[in-house]
Structures are given as structure tokens and as C-alpha cells.
């Protein structure tokens, strides 16, 4: 459909090779994906929905195409919350852009990276300041429930605010967690938390025999008392 006369209307740019390209004044050249752009002009020769990548980050500029670049004029390699935007720590989640300097305004409410300088964390669904990746920095062990514990485990309910999480023997808020795992043996008393021998006497201040269960209460607390 394109003539070989280079001076004619819409001359064939590839007169010796069959092709159907019709964009960028490059007519009649091979166009593998049929999007109108010659393979030599097309940054995505097997994807008919994308053809140009202005910032050379691997994501196409067409917002309606496959994997569209969210920041078409700024090179970036984010791939999780949006494609092709700056991702300082390289975890796949783009840096927040509250002013829209690189593209549309984008905040943590849009799933931007809450920790743009920490490759191990990116989101905090329960807003308790501990990241949801349990294997990452200060990982939240109860990502679905806000909590302030930080001694035995991070981000779980701590009723008395002493830093030790409440026991969770059925795993309602996270993994099963008992006093044996480090949970608070006294979840309603901020001054006590450990009872290694399970005798009901606090190890840190009261139990004179913290590693041996006992019921003594007179001369000393929490030690064996043979006659009761």
C-alpha cells in the first residue's frame, strides 16, 4: 500500500521489505505487533499497547497500555504500587510524591513506600509504626492489629504498656504466643512481665527463686515450701 517513489505521497520507507507501519512518517516497514510503529521505532515490538518509553526505564508511556509508566518523564523502576517511578530502596514500591513532582500526586494512601530508604519494609496496614514484613526491620508480628509491644515481639497488643505483648494462646491477633515465648505473664501490671517458673511471682523484683516454682510467702517469695 506504499509506493516506492521516495518523492511520492507516503513513500515506502522499506521498499524491499514488506511491512505495514504507518506512524512517525515511517511507512511500509516491519511492524511485529501491528500497532503502526515500525519495529525500528517501537520500544516494545511485541506489545501492541505500548511503543515509546521516553525515560528508558522499561515501562511504556501509554497510560492505557500494559504496565504503563506512572512517571513518564522520570526514570524509575518501581513495580508494585505503580510502574516506572523512583524507588530509592529498590523494593518495588515507589517513593511518595506528595507534590506530584515526578507524576501524579502519590502518597502512602496510594500504597507508596512508607519506608523509602528501607528495602525490607514498605507498608504498615495497622498504622502502629511497625512494618508488615515480619522478616524486615522491626517487623510487625501482628500486622492486622495495631499494637505497641517491642520487647518480646513487635507491634502486638500490650495492654499494660510495659513493652511486652499480651499472651495470645489461640493466635487471634498473630501467631500463637504464650508466656513461654516471652509474652507478658502479668498483662495488666506494667511493673511486672516475667515469671519463668510459672509460680505467679514476678521474676524481676519479687521471686527469690525465679527458676524454681514455689509457694513460699513469708521469709521469701516464690521458693519451694514443703509443708505449705
Predicted regions and their residues:
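Extracellular calcium-associated, cysteine-rich motifs in secreted modular proteins
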Residues: 1-228
